[in-house]
Amino acid sequence: MFRYFYLLLFLFGSLINRAQNNEQAYFDQALSNGKVANEAFRRSHHFLQGWLTKADPATGLIPRNLTQSTCIWNAWDAAADNYPFMVMTASMLDKPLFEGKMREILATETRLTSRVGRLPDTYSFCKKAFENAEIDTSQIVFGSAEYMKDGLIPLTEWLGPSPWSERMLGILADLDKIVDVPTQIKGSFFGNSAVVEVGGDLLQVLARMYWLTKNPKWLAWGIQIGDYYLSEAHLPTRALQRLRLRDHGCEIVSGLVEMYAVVSVVNPAKKKQWQPYIHEMLDTILAKGRNEHGLFYDEVNPLTGEVIQKRIADNFGYTLNAFYTVYLIDKKAAYRDATLKALSALNANYRNHDWESGSADGYADAIEGTMNLYLREPITSVKEWLDSEIKVLWNFQKPDGIIEGWHGDGNFARTSLMYALWKTAGTQLSNWNQEVMYGAVAEKNAVYITLSSPKAWSGKLVFGGQWHKQNLHLPFDYPRINQFQEWFPIEANKSYELTIDGKSLNVKGSVLLAGYPLQLKPQQTIQVRCKR
């Protein structure tokens, strides 16, 4: 009898030791994650500081780029791709700058660039006036759509309602007065796919702004554009001889699927009407748009299957977001299989790949899209690829913080911040300090966080929430461009077991979301476990 008792006691003790060893391994990994997260944060902050030195002294606006167009701010580049991620960086890492200079730039941009109502046009620092004497409606429509989708949407995903979401809703309201379904964008500057790009931009904006506001006007407009494209006459894979599966064209695929996700919840009859067209479009892209690894070509003819541009699209993840979303809605396994095939090919075949003719932007977009999908399908080799490729991206940064000196530099910060939030499991410091190392590991029902600092620090550890729900009111967290991944989302109304250096207490989720107070002494390391 006693022999069995001691055996059980021994086994129980062994299990406890194993659990403790596993937990310590998680805390050790969290510390390692904190080192790379810290580098991502520092590089993003350095980008912000570098670009602020290039701002126009009179207006405070940043130029379109540093090699040409140095005298202008435009909606579809400076406003859409660079400035928003300066704002985002400041919101995480430099609160005084966020509340001050970043808001000032928004106010100045709104005052100086609004030309047709609240719709922005290109502003010249040198002329102290609009760059073009005459109003070019195509340029204004294109710039407005790009500013909303690429710039103001990600800020709203991160911040929720804010002055930037108000700017977007103002642009959207005034754009509604001059366009319904965009069918003509004049000017060769915008490439061969400007019409579908603007249509896709609007669909993505309308889908998310409908959920944010519940304004039926945005739903009706989105359905109007969806009805146009999801039809016998205008389905992109039937009507287009050139279908771009990279940015500046692939937006239409993602946009149609985002609006499909909306109607799948609020209008089942419309969802049923659109479903055959959505599936046909995606099936055609799978049949004619991929290479042997399941990644997409830059551009194909969907009618003949001709590959027009054989370069592999760095935006493959954006298009796969659409496939995975339809998989979530319709449970069509082929769309998940397509995602898994592409992801599984990355580490073996696309390390240090030349995504966009040597540009950092190609790496930034490829990494962002992959992180979205890795959240849903955590394949080990994908983690290895992400950890490898972020270093390739970081090598583009110059000593002054500038990346390549054009508007695409903003995407460097966007992706670096996303990477850091992965390595911190969505947690942040209320008052970021570059000397404080903190990282996390999310494992099933718990997140393990390690913090250390060479100097004393006090502040709050802010946990990540269900951003899709609390910021945009989305009904489910489908993969989408410009979202911020939820690695360990805290729910405000639930209770969690918080253990700090071995001492446990129950804490409401709302407290964790607001930030839990912590203090670090010089050279101290703190281990925090949060358990569902």
Stretches found by the model and what they are:
Residues 1-22:
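Bacterial Sec-dependent N-terminal signal peptides
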Residues 20-530:
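Glycan-recognition and catalytic cores of secretory/periplasmic carbohydrate-active enzymes
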